[in-house]
Amino acid sequence: MKFYIDDLPVLFPYPKIYPEQYNYMCDIKKTLDVGGNSILEMPSGTGKTVSLLSLTIAYQMHYPEHRKIIYCSRTMSEIEKALVELENLMDYRTKELGYQEDFRGLGLTSRKNLCLHPEVSKERKGTVVDEKCRRMTNGQAKRKLEEDPEANVELCEYHENLYNIEVEDYLPKGVFSFEKLLKYCEEKTLCPYFIVRRMISLCNIIIYSYHYLLDPKIAERVSNEVSKDSIVIFDEAHNIDNVCIESLSLDLTTDALRRATRGANALDERISEVRKVDSQKLQDEYEKLVQGLHSADILTDQEEPFVETPVLPQDLLTEAIPGNIRRAEHFVSFLKRLIEYLKTRMKVLHVISETPKSFLQHLKQLTFIERKPLRFCSERLSLLVRTLEVTEVEDFTALKDIATFATLISTYEEGFLLIIEPYEIENAAVPNPIMRFTCLDASIAIKPVFERFSSVIITSGTISPLDMYPRMLNFKTVLQKSYAMTLAKKSFLPMIITKGSDQVAISSRFEIRNDPSIVRNYGSMLVEFAKITPDGMVVFFPSYLYMESIVSMWQTMGILDEVWKHKLILVETPDAQETSLALETYRKACSNGRGAILLSVARGKVSEGIDFDHQYGRTVLMIGIPFQYTESRILKARLEFMRENYRIRENDFLSFDAMRHAAQCLGRVLRGKDDYGVMVLADRRFSRKRSQLPKWIAQGLSDADLNLSTDMAISNTKQFLRTMAQPTDPKDQEGVSVWSYEDLIKHQNSRKDQGGFIENENKEGEQDEDEDEDIEMQ
């Protein structure tokens, strides 16, 4: 379908379009025209990705600036999905225009997913793959071979073959999904990872994970060549604040400190060896540092530093590395002193939390280590590892963490906290101390993105309440909007169950969650829904701990035996492989008619990235409100920080956080307008939180369904499922929830008549101002 938004011709790869897709595109165009940031909440399963791509690529191709698009998503499967959508869109554009546009679209993921080297790709741990790859591809190994052809150095042929080709000729033009990229590179014996890395500046659109833009350790290497007028899109961005915080946080355990000591000793031995054989090497390095050169000046283009800079670009120091860590021996003994100090700090019996400033003061009093040399730790370690030509870099990963920790704690003060806990997990009998350097302010990591790029679009299916994000991430928006879902026939039934059939109020509140009457009520609710739900049913709990305790109580009450009669029961566990197996079995049981129930956790893998479309999810049951564990020291510190700096009250944030996760769980069952499902929120506290649900869920929640008992909810569900079982005529949806080209033109004309819009010749103008939608123009 081809239509115009103002003067912009948009090619949409489907013959029909949803009204909300059209409104969404109009708002994205407004954001791009005005420049600035917007937050848009689009209902689940209404083709958000394809709308985003259709509009932004039309915008890119139509206007002469050809602004690059950076599309960030969370998981590997979402990135792959976006690439496939992009491929379809570009095929459609080629067909409609009659020629192939000069266009490149690529996706980037970790080495582990893209490596083709027969030995390295066998490794299961991502960090090991990274280190082995670096060892075979860094410029040092290549130089060594050139100097001494007999040297025992292994190079990666996939990477070496890239030197024979010009960067723009690595790949033909077009869009490459991961599958297509790997296949092409396998045939040509080329390295897919480095192809994408080096072609980023040549791409029209690059699709990758948030970390490549938000985590300074990676962003500096990957995204520094991206132009400032790029359009940045954060898709599935309901958790973006957590990603920002993780990118500047670090945990150290006693085991890591032990390994770091071993690493420092190994470095010492290596320095002694080099002193005997080639002492000039160390002298050269020392002289370079005296001249005030940095790793950026010393490393060649093809080399990556051993320790990536963990701080944001604007916080880097440009002065020379301090004198007391220039000599290799001095630096290693400096690291050893630091590690020994950290070991003594770990010997605690109760939780300690302190600011970076007080930690550095105490460190200076005891070990005479100044703040300045600490800031250069990661850079100095990179240079030393390079000078010593260390090949077994895996031995030094713990040392890398120590250097990163030193650089972070000496660079940042405001919005950071150091917490030392004697027990890594609650109720542990054996002390296993852990030192957490944690970022409390989500805006620090994302600030460079807002400062650097003119348009940033943050979007998701569950991002309500919208005004929380600009406050948490400290930025201004030009547009905030939540879209309702247009339906010819109600295809999802949200309900809030506040009491069991015996009228006892149900809740997962900590004080009463193990009360037998509440557990029994939750159990009988599960049995009743299992009886009437066709095929698949997904149940979410607030935490693994609560799920384990309630399931074992159900077992003793005989509730699970009752459920078995109707459906299989499968459980999500913290182990990724077990969960994958459970999901596979669940899908099999749903497809062959046995039906199944999947018990999972609100912040787990299942709730975040797995879709239960059609028969795989007909009912989703949310047992209890998924609040965070409020006794966590880090959470307490973060809440206090937000209250003092951003005036966000503790309860507001906790409630917002719980509701975005609950909405995320509910959205799993509705993956399109032809899909249907029942959404049950089972906790009496939900009835007060209706306003915090996304607009499209709240619109389907009638006043009568806010305070139901189990038996009333069951009778509503029976009626709803009977209605949905009737064959539907697709014609009923036309013009209401699905628009043909004619409907779209009709809508544009009616808007034009209302808004007195000046018509371009032969072009359909559009001005979309829905009074009823919560829109903010600043």
Curated annotation (Swiss-Prot):
Residue ranges of the region described as Disordered: 750-778
Residues bound to [4Fe-4S] cluster: 115, 133, 156, 191
Q: What happens when the gene is disrupted?
A: Essential, it cannot be deleted.
- Has UniProt tagged this entry with the keyword Protein biosynthesis? no
Q: Which PROSITE patterns match?
A: DEAH_ATP_HELICASE (PS00690), HELICASE_ATP_BIND_2 (PS51193)
EC nos = 5.6.2.3
**pH dependence, entry free text:** Optimum pH is 5.6 for both helicase and ATPase activites, suggesting they are coupled.
MF terms (GO), sorted A to Z: 4 iron, 4 sulfur cluster binding; 5'-3' DNA helicase activity; ATP binding; ATP hydrolysis activity; ATP-dependent activity, acting on DNA; damaged DNA binding; DNA helicase activity; metal ion binding
| Free-text comment on the cofactor | Binds 1 [4Fe-4S] cluster. ssDNA-dependent ATPase activity requires Mg(2+); Mn(2+) can partially replace Mg(2+).
Boundaries of every Helicase ATP-binding domain copy: 7-285
Q: Which UniProt keywords apply?
A: 4Fe-4S, ATP-binding, DNA damage, DNA repair, DNA-binding, Helicase, Hydrolase, Iron, Iron-sulfur, Isomerase, Metal-binding, Nucleotide-binding, Nucleus, Transcription, Transcription regulation
Entry cofactors: [4Fe-4S] cluster; Mg(2+)
The Basic and acidic residues compositionally biased stretches are 750-765
Per its UniProt record, what InterPro entries does this chain match? ATP-dep_Helicase_C, DinG/Rad3-like, DNA/RNA_helicase_DEAH_CS, HBB, Helic_SF1/SF2_ATP-bd_DinG/Rad3, Helicase-like_DEXD_c2, P-loop_NTPase, RAD3-like_helicase_DEAD
Q: State the Pfam families in the record.
A: DEAD_2, HBB, Helicase_C_2
Q: Which stretches are tagged as biased composition: Acidic residues?
A: 766-778
Effect ascribed to mutating residue 111 to H: Intermediate level of UV-sensitivity
**Where is this protein chiefly located?**
nucleus
**Any one Gene Ontology biological process term?**
transcription by RNA polymerase II
Q: Name one GO cellular component term.
A: transcription factor TFIIH core complex
The extra comment attached to this record reads: Present with 14400 molecules/cell in log phase SD medium.
What is known about what this protein does?
A: ATP-dependent 5'-3' DNA helicase. Component of the general transcription and DNA repair factor IIH (TFIIH) core complex, which is involved in general and transcription-coupled nucleotide excision repair (NER) of damaged DNA and, when complexed to TFIIK, in RNA transcription by RNA polymerase II. In NER, TFIIH acts by opening DNA around the lesion to allow the excision of the damaged oligonucleotide and its replacement by a new DNA fragment. The ATP-dependent helicase activity of XPD/RAD3 is required for DNA opening. In transcription, TFIIH has an essential role in transcription initiation.
The record's section on PANTHER family has:
DNA REPAIR DEAD HELICASE RAD3/XP-D SUBFAMILY MEMBER, GENERAL TRANSCRIPTION AND DNA REPAIR FACTOR IIH HELICASE SUBUNIT XPD
Which NCBIfam families does this one have? Answer: rad3
Binding partners and assembly: Component of the 7-subunit TFIIH core complex composed of XPB/SSL2, XPD/RAD3, SSL1, TFB1, TFB2, TFB4 and TFB5, which is active in NER. The core complex associates with the 3-subunit CTD-kinase module TFIIK composed of CCL1, KIN28 and TFB3 to form the 10-subunit holoenzyme (holo-TFIIH) active in transcription. An additionnal subunit, TFB6, plays a role in the dissociation of the SSL2 helicase from TFIIH after transcription initiation.
Q: What is this protein called?
A: General transcription and DNA repair factor IIH helicase subunit XPD/RAD3
In the UniProt record, what gene is named as encoding this protein? RAD3
